Amino acid sequence: MQAVSLPACSRLPLRYSLAPLLEALQRIPAEAWQGHFNSGYYQGDWSGVALIAAEDAPLPLAPGHGAPRRSAWWQGDAVWHELLAGFGDALRSARLLRLGPGSRIHEHCDHDLGLPGSDLRLHIPLLSPPGVEFLLDGLQVPMQPGECWFLDLSRPHRVSNASRLPRIHLVLDCLPQAWLLQAIAQGQASTPAPQASTAVQAFERLRGHIERDAGLAQRLRVLTDTEAFIAATLRMGQDLGLEFSAAEVRAAMRQGKGDWSGQWRAR
């Protein structure tokens, strides 16, 4: 099958009323949520409930290649029927995925989604409190509750939830039917641009402090050991109340093409 060129993300021209969906969430028993099978991919609580799964899936939340089978637990709830009916026979799986407060999904790629003719992954945020950050190719995807987004998750992505509330998305895998590909293309024109991560924004604020303060620049300029430079930069950020990681420092060093001390000279 010929490969189709897809964007990193696209907000589809679909919107959903949140109130009935949130009420339907409340009707799900607490014991129905199961831990995600990729236990090495996350820290904290990453759990889910399957609405539709492949009949040969080894676990309810795991992928499979068989025919889609609907779980019994939601058959009496019209809310889920109404939403899922809009995807017709393109729908291969549907899962509610919850990332608990203080939890994170480590960066990874879903390589099976990048193959020719592979399923298209859609996210419909239901609960997404401030403090949730979904990074795709290192940039925040500005998904809002009630929207529907296509995400190319064969690319590097990670999620963190720094809030005190759970983040819950309805995640759909769909066949690449023509109408869905058209909706993805149509949505690109109005898709908000991804933003730098909060850590990158914090790191850029530190750069501003260093550019204005020759003393800070000198403290870094005298360091010749890479690890010592990174550690000093992290401490400097902490002293200023700026949260970022060694990854942001290393990225700046790579962009500096080796002259990682020279880039800190006050200008």
Where are these regions (language model features)?
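A short hydrophobic beta-strand segment most commonly corresponding to one strand
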Residues: 120-125, 148-150, 164-182
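Terminal, compositionally biased segments used for targeting/anchoring and flexible tails
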Residues: 182-267
